[in-house]
From Swiss-Prot:
The keyword rRNA-binding does not apply. This is D-aminoacyl-tRNA deacylase. Keywords: Cytoplasm, Hydrolase, RNA-binding, tRNA-binding. GO terms for molecular function: D-tyrosyl-tRNA(Tyr) deacylase activity; tRNA binding. The keyword Cytoplasm applies. Homodimer.
């Protein structure tokens, strides 16, 4: 499973000219599910999203001291199979390593559930529309953008 974790001042997802999800301060996360991914990958990626320290200390003196939970941030996730694109041969991307729709949706939904379980009461994980063409907007804070692949986490 792959994730692009972006610290954001704001983010939104628009489908058919309608905003379906939006956040202010927090994370915008693109998540790709691979055909070899399992529940173990779900656990790993959800933990990275909620626990990675991407914000400075409260006094601003030290970088990388607080997670999205620590700063009271929101989380907006967007499914994105194109994170598994290969472009080694030719010009056309190859998506064979991405999970097919039903498997991808099941594991993606599990990631959302794990993140939701970690959020304090009253806060909900936001997401786009699985499989839809979406306009994803964000104001990247920093910019801070982290790539994570559960198969290459050693």
């Amino acid at each position: 499973m792959r994730a692009v974790i972006q610290r954001a001042k704001s983010g939104s997802v628009t489908v058919d000219s309608k905003i379906v999800s939006q956040i202010s301060h927090g994370l915008v996360v693109l998540i790709g599910v691979g055909h070899e991914d399992t529940a173990e990958d779900v656990e790993k990626v959800a933990n990275k999203i909620i626990k990675t320290k991407l914000w400075p200390s409260v006094d601003g003196a030290q970088q990388w001291k607080q997670s999205v939970l620590d700063v009271g941030g929101e989380v907006l996730c967007v499914s994105q199979f194109t994170l598994f694109a290969k472009v080694k041969k030719g010009q056309k991307p190859d998506f064979h390593n991405a999970a097919k729709g039903p498997q991808a949706k099941e594991l993606y939904d599990q990631v959302l559930a794990k993140i939701q379980a970690a959020l304090p009461e009253g806060r909900t994980v936001k997401d786009g529309v699985f499989g839809a063409m979406m306009d994803v907007a964000l104001v990247n804070d920093g910019p801070v953008t982290i790539q994570y692949d559960t198969k290459n986490d050693k």
